[in-house]
Curated annotation (Swiss-Prot):
Similarity comment text for this entry: Belongs to the pterin-4-alpha-carbinolamine dehydratase family.
GO molecular function term, any single one: 4-alpha-hydroxytetrahydrobiopterin dehydratase activity
The reaction(s) this protein catalyses: (4aS,6R)-4a-hydroxy-L-erythro-5,6,7,8-tetrahydrobiopterin = (6R)-L-erythro-6,7-dihydrobiopterin + H2O
Entry protein name: Putative pterin-4-alpha-carbinolamine dehydratase
Length: 107
C-alpha cells in the first residue's frame, strides 16, 4: 500500500468489507485483524521498557495530530497498538492510514 501513510484522515469513513480489509492488511506486515473482527492490531517486542514507552508515545502523538486515537498497551519489553473506528462499527480506511503512518515512523 505505497503512499497509504500520506493519505488524509476523513471524518465519517465507513467500515471496510472483509474483502477490502484482507487486501489492505496484506500491505501492512505485522498488522492483523483482532479476534473481535472490528479492530486491527500489531505487537512489538523490545529489549527494555524505554523503547516500549517510546513507541507508545509515538503512537499517541500521531493520534493527537490526526484526531484518530488507538488503544495502546505497553510494558517492559512489549507494546500493542489497536485501531478501530468506533463510529463506523469496525475498521475504516482511517485505521489503515494510521497503521501505515506508525509503520513509516518506526521504519
Amino acid at each position: 500500500m505505497t503512499g497509504l501513510d500520506r493519505e488524509r484522515i476523513v471524518d465519517g469513513a465507513p467500515a471496510l468489507s472483509a474483502e477490502e480489509l484482507q487486501a489492505a492488511l496484506a500491505g501492512l506486515p505485522g498488522w492483523q485483524l483482532a479476534g473481535d473482527g472490528k479492530s486491527i492490531c500489531r505487537e512489538w517486542r523490545f529489549k527494555n521498557f524505554k523503547q516500549a514507552a517510546q513507541l507508545a508515545n509515538l503512537a499517541a502523538w500521531q493520534a493527537e495530530a490526526a484526531g484518530h486515537h488507538p488503544d495502546i498497551a505497553f510494558g517492559w519489553g512489549h507494546a500493542r497498538v489497536s485501531y478501530s473506528t468506533h463510529s463506523a462499527g469496525g475498521v475504516s480506511r482511517n485505521d489503515l492510514i494510521m497503521a501505515a503512518r506508525l509503520d513509516a515512523a518506526t521504519g
